[in-house]
Amino acid sequence: MAGRSRRRSFWSVGVAAALLCLLAAHGCSAKHHKPKPTPGGISGNASSSSSNSSTPSIPPPVAPTPTAPTPPIPSPGTGSSNGSSGGGGGGWLNARATWYGAPNGAGPDDNGGACGFKNVNLPPFSAMTSCGNEPLFKDGKGCGSCYQIRCVGHPACSGLPETVIITDMNYYPVSLYHFDLSGTAFGAMAKDNRNDELRHAGIIDIQFRRVPCQYPGLTVTFHVEQGSNPVYMAILVEYENGDGDVVQVDLMESRYSTGGVDGTPTGVWTPMRESWGSIWRLDTNHPLQGPFSLRITNESGKTLIADQVIPADWQPNTVYSSIVQFD
C-alpha cells in the first residue's frame, strides 16, 4: 500500500510539472484566440505570441467547463485602477497567476490579444495586462475589465496591489480563477529588485478583486477596424471608465442628404453583434450612411451615447474619439 501511495504522489507531482511547462511555453498565445471574422466569411488566425517563457510549442488542451462564478461588478470607491495600494477593503478572492512573453513585455509579440486592443505596451495599458480564463474573459464580455492583484506566499511578493486590465484569454485548467499576466505585470507584484526572482517562480498564488477602471483625461474611443466598408462596419470600443467592459453596442445612421451636407440622425438604433473580444460588427444589405452615432451599454446596464462620433467620410483603421465618458 505504501508503494502504491508513493507512486500516486510521484504521478501528481509529474502532472503539476508538466502543466507548468505547458503554461510557460504558451501563456495565452494568439494561437488560442478565436479567429477574427472578416467580411465574406473568411477567417484567419492572429500571429503567435512570444515563447520567451520556456519550452517548445505544443497544442493547447481543451478548455474545461468553468465552474467559478464571474467576479462581482465593482462598486464606486472599491479600489482604483491606477496601481495604487489604497482603495477599500475586503472582496479579495483567491486565484493563481502565470506569465508569458518577454520578462518586461506586454504579453503578445504584437502587443495585442484576443480582445482586439492594440499597442497594449503603451499608455494607458502600459503593459499591465492579463489573459483571463472564462470566468474573467467571459467569452469576450470581460475585455477591458480592471482587477487589483497581489501575490501571496512567496518570499519575493510585495503584498501590495497592482492593477491589470483583461486584454486576452487563456483557458488552461490551472485554477478556478487564472490570470496569465504579462511579464511586466507579474514582476510588478514583487518587492524592489526581486522582479526576476518572482518571475522564476512560474505559477504563484495571488488574490484579486475587481475594481472600477479609471482613464483620467481620456474619453471613450472607437477604432474602425481594417476591412470595414459601406456594408460592413467593425468597431473596437476602448477606454470606458467604471466597469471597463461593454455588453452591447448599437449604431444609428444618418439620413441621406444632397449637396455634401451631413444628414440628421435617423433616430433608429440598430444592434451590432459582438464579433470577437471588444470588437462589434454590423453587416447590412445597404450602404451605411454616416455620420454614425453609437450607444454602448456596460455590464452594470449603464448606457452612453456618442452622437455622430464617426463622420460621413470615415476611413478604416482610424480612431475616432468621443466627447463622452462613463461617470
Curated annotation (Swiss-Prot):
Signal sequence bounds: 1-30
Membrane topology: Peripheral membrane protein
InterPro entries (UniProt xref): Expan_Lol_pI, Expansin/allergen_DPBB_dom, Expansin_CBD, Expansin_CBD_sf, LolPI, RlpA-like_DPBB, RlpA-like_sf
Positions annotated as glycosylated: N45, N52, N82, N298
Localisation: Secreted, Cell wall; Membrane
An annotated GO cellular component: membrane
Disulfide bonds: C115-C143, C146-C213, C151-C157
Main localization, broad class: secreted
Record's keyword terms, sorted: Cell wall, Cell wall biogenesis/degradation, Disulfide bond, Glycoprotein, Membrane, Secreted, Signal
Sequence segments annotated as region (Disordered): 30-88
Stated family: Belongs to the expansin family. Expansin B subfamily.
PANTHER family tied to this protein: EXPANSIN-B3 (PTHR31692), EXPANSIN-B7 (PTHR31692:SF23)
Protein role: May cause loosening and extension of plant cell walls by disrupting non-covalent bonding between cellulose microfibrils and matrix glucans. No enzymatic activity has been found. May be required for rapid internodal elongation in deepwater rice during submergence.
Protein name: Expansin-B7
Organism: Oryza sativa subsp. japonica (Rice)
This protein's encoding gene: EXPB7
